[in-house]
Amino acid sequence: GLLGGLLGPLLGGGGGGGGGLL
């Protein structure tokens, strides 16, 4: 998600450096 970098790699998917499931 777009909030990956803010919420973390577990919650975001490719957002702001986050690569999680959502």
UniProtKB/Swiss-Prot annotation:
Keywords assigned by UniProt, alphabetized: Amphibian defense peptide, Antibiotic, Antimicrobial, Secreted
Biological processes, Gene Ontology terms: defense response to bacterium
Coiled coil regions in record: none
Tissue: Expressed by the skin glands.
GO cellular component: extracellular region
Superkingdom of origin organism: Eukaryota
Cellular location(s): Secreted
Region ranges (Disordered): 1-22
Functional description taken from the UniProt entry: Antimicrobial protein. Has antibacterial activity against the Gram-negative bacteria E.coli ATCC 28922 (MIC=50 uM), P.aeruginosa ATCC 9027 (MIC=8 uM) and C.freundii ATCC 8090 (MIC=75 uM). Does not have hemolytic activity.
Protein name, UniProt field: Leptoglycin
